[in-house]
Amino acid sequence: MPAVPIRFGHARLGYRWTRYFGWSVRKLHVRGAADALAGLGHLGIRSAVDTALRPDTRSCNICGWSGSRFYPNVGPGYYEREASCPRCSCIHRYRTLAIVLGMASDFFSPEKSVIEVAPVRSFQAYCLWRKEGRNYLSFDLERFAMEPGDLTAMRYADNACDYFLCYHVLEHVPADVQALAEIFRVLRPGGTAILQVPIDWSLTDTVEYGRPNERETGHVRRYSDTGFGARIMAAGFELLKLRPSDLIDDSLIARHGLSTEPIYFARKPLSVSAARRL
């Protein structure tokens, strides 16, 4: 686990749920207010009872926490019952990502260069620990990243990195085709982009909203599985879709509260024609 523990998970979760409760009340969103209150309840009496009476059946592979249950992850348009680590607030999809990348790639090798857009603090700290503080860089419009940057107009040179991590970001980006083209550009030939977005499995085609949807945390579209895959391949990538259950035992999935959402590995071909890059 990281040498420096990631702290204040309770405080960050409480702040997030309190803000979501206030937003829901202002928007007269009854279900959202109820979900936020349920999340806050896990920080109070229920958390103390769980700690005292229940065995350690769950553990976080990011920070080393162990306990009886994970906390809910709530926000506009979603309520995930057991998702957030009580200590570091890392959610299930990043715990899953850490295991999958460790098993299926050399992403965490200190020799491999990684660029991540829109990092979360817990996973960023974990990456820096695993990579011995080397060859990891993050950027975003928000303050938690290592430097500011725009996914649709990155300042990095062509062929700059071995891996590019873009997790639950493209659904917020109006020009997602341009963003994928930029990711393709900065990856070295043979490099891989690790991508994930919320998928609506009932859709056959991606739905564009035309503007940010407040009830979906500002998403500008709803992807279908085939639609997302088609956009990745249209950018020039070779696509491998990997389900965590293909690699990880059911008992480990339960222990670490892992996500079952597929992860999209988009590989830049070793030989790339100039026309394909435009």
Which positions does each model-derived feature cover?
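Short catalytic micro-motifs in class I SAM-dependent methyltransferases
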Residues: 167-172
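Conserved N-terminal segment of class I S-adenosyl-L-methionine
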Residues: 4-157, 243, 250-278
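Hydrophobic beta-strand segment of the Class I
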Residues: 156, 161-165
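S-adenosyl-L-methionine-dependent methyltransferase catalytic module, highlighting the catalytic core
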Residues: 45-58, 62, 174-183, 188, ...
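Aromatic-residue hotspot detector
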Residues: 68-71, 161, 212, 235-237
